[in-house]
Amino acid sequence: MKTYYEKDANVELLQGKTVAVVGYGSQGHAQAQNLRDSGVEVVVGVRPGKSYEVAKADGFEVMSVSEAVRTAQVVQMLLPDEQQAHVYKAEVEENLREGQMLLFSHGFNIHFGQINPPSYVDVAMVAPKSPGHLVRRVFQEGNGVPALVAVHQDATGTALHVALAYAKGVGCTRAGVIETTFQEETETDLFGEQAVLCGGVTALVKAGFETLTEGGYRPEIAYFECLHELKLIVDLMYEGGLTTMRHSISDTAEFGDYVTGSRIVTDETKKEMKRVLTEIQQGEFAKKWILENQAGRPTYNAMKKAEQNHQLEKVGAELREMMSWIHAPKELVKK
């Protein structure tokens, strides 16, 4: 595994250049501010709206996406996956020029052919492995979060060096930047989201909750046992892996882990995981998601509404009112 650190990167490669950060959401605001604090000239490219006003209030020169691309030598695309291809075709593509670098923090649109940059620009990825607020906070504390780096197209012969300079400007080389490919990052990221982190976990939590309530147990108790306490376990795993988690729980819980876990996640579950991975690798999921967006998201919206009306959500909202240490978000906005 090739990993790059501070000594391997030179942020001075960005001196005299302008970086355009396209999008000012979770990653956009963090990367733009970290770069600025590292002495890099940054402009923000967004359309008029809330993000435009926030970026302006944060002291950035804010302009249209097309103007930002014309101004910059490095263009970082930090819009949501489903918006990138449209914005690229409408405002980025015709303004690219020889020797520029087009950067991404997720490989979806490049890997699945939704964006096809011209051969005369560098195409690379710097993907911090933390949400934007943590990228910013850890940087301000003098540290950094790990990241991935990949080069898809090296027109200038310096793509990796410039990408590492960008990673250093964001603070990621302080922790370590692991070399990967657009294919590996994209396929593993989608699989992790679908099979484990989002799809797998939410299905497991709901199934456990429903099993208890259907068995006659009160929904409030089922919520505590199947969702609320999940954070306690995940935090232990996050801090020290499975061994630390198992060391920290009771022996009864640990024994139950060993003898029961494989009855829940069975060989059939793993076979289904492999089918999910194959669908991702063959582009079936990407095609489904692209078509879903083109159709106005009918399936997405229907499933989202149904999930929000699940008994688990209603019970959870009531119980969280008892938890003074939980600060509910004022507004649920996708960044």
From Swiss-Prot:
Top-rank EC class of the record's enzyme: oxidoreductase
Organism domain of life: Bacteria
Pfam family, one: KARI_C
Cofactor(s) the protein needs: Mg(2+)
Annotated GO MF terms: ketol-acid reductoisomerase activity; magnesium ion binding; NADP binding
Protein's UniProt keywords contain Amino-acid biosynthesis: yes
Cellular component GO terms, alphabetical: cytosol
Residues engaged in binding Mg(2+) 1: 189, 193
The protein's Enzyme Commission number: 1.1.1.86
Entry function: Involved in the biosynthesis of branched-chain amino acids (BCAA). Catalyzes an alkyl-migration followed by a ketol-acid reduction of (S)-2-acetolactate (S2AL) to yield (R)-2,3-dihydroxy-isovalerate. In the isomerase reaction, S2AL is rearranged via a Mg-dependent methyl migration to produce 3-hydroxy-3-methyl-2-ketobutyrate (HMKB). In the reductase reaction, this 2-ketoacid undergoes a metal-dependent reduction by NADPH to yield (R)-2,3-dihydroxy-isovalerate.
Record's protein name: Ketol-acid reductoisomerase (NADP(+)) 2
Source organism of this protein record: Bacillus cereus (strain ATCC 14579 / DSM 31 / CCUG 7414 / JCM 2152 / NBRC 15305 / NCIMB 9373 / NCTC 2599 / NRRL B-3711)
Taxonomic lineage from the root: Bacteria, Bacillati, Bacillota, Bacilli, Bacillales
